From Swiss-Prot:
PROSITE patterns: TIM_1, TIM_2. One of its GO terms (molecular function) is triose-phosphate isomerase activity. Pathway: Carbohydrate biosynthesis; gluconeogenesis; Carbohydrate degradation; glycolysis; D-glyceraldehyde 3-phosphate from glycerone phosphate: step 1/1. It comes from Prochlorococcus marinus (strain MIT 9313). One of its GO terms (cellular component) is cytosol. GO terms for biological process: gluconeogenesis; glyceraldehyde-3-phosphate biosynthetic process; glycerol catabolic process; glycolytic process. The keyword Cell cycle does not apply. It catalyses: D-glyceraldehyde 3-phosphate = dihydroxyacetone phosphate. Homodimer. This is Triosephosphate isomerase.
Amino acid sequence: MRKPVIAGNWKMHMTCAQAREYTAMFLPLIEATPNDRHVVIAPPFTAISSMAESVGGTRLELSSQNVHWEDDGAYTAEVSPTMLLEHQVRYAIVGHSEPRKYFSESDEQINRRARSAQAHGLIPIVCVGESDEQRERGEAERVIRRQVEQGLEDTDPDKLVVAYEPIWAIGTGKTCEASEANRICGLIRRWVGASELIIQYGGSVKPGNIDELMAMSDIDGVLVGGASLDPESFARIANYQTS
C-alpha cells in the first residue's frame, strides 16, 4: 500500500524565528490529519535545528533541501547525511530543478546524492521534469526517462520518492492537468518497474487543486512550493480529501 507523502519545500524562505512561529501555528492544524499520509516540510538548513526541537513526537517530519554524497570534506556550502541525521531529518530532496538550472547539477551527481541518502537511512525525494522548451519539442518523455534511469541507478525504489515537477509549472501559476500528471507518473512507475514506488506531483500545487490531484491513481503525494509557506494553506493541502 503506497502511503502518500505531502511535502512542503520552503526553498530560501523563513528565518529560524519565522519557522518557529509557523510551526506553532501549523501543528494544531494537522493534529487530526489522517494517519494514511506523511506530512513533511523542507526548511532551509539554518532552520532545521530549531524546527527539530518543535516537531519531535508530532505528525510533522523534516526533510533537507539537498544532501551531499560524502560524510565530510572540503565541500563548501554542502551538507552531509550525518549532519542531517543529528536533527531528526528523515527525507532529502535531490535533483530539484533549481539546483539543476542554477548550479548545473548533473544526473550523475543527483544519483550520488540519492545513493548516499539511502545508505545513511534517509529517504531521497528525487525530482525529475521537463522544461517548457522540451515539452514544446515533444521531448518530455525522453528527458524524464533519462533523468529517472540515471538518477535512480543502483538505488532501492522501495526506499525513495520520485517527484515529477514539470519545470514550466513551478512558481508560474500554470498547473499540469491532473490527468496528464497522472499519465506521466504512471510512465515513471512502469519505467522503474516498482509498483510500490511513491510518486509525487510538484508544480503550482495549491488548496484549489489538491483534491483533484490526489484522486489520481498514480499520484502518491505532492511537493509544494509557495503554497507551503502559509500554514493554513499547507494544512488544507495536508488535509486533502478524495471523496
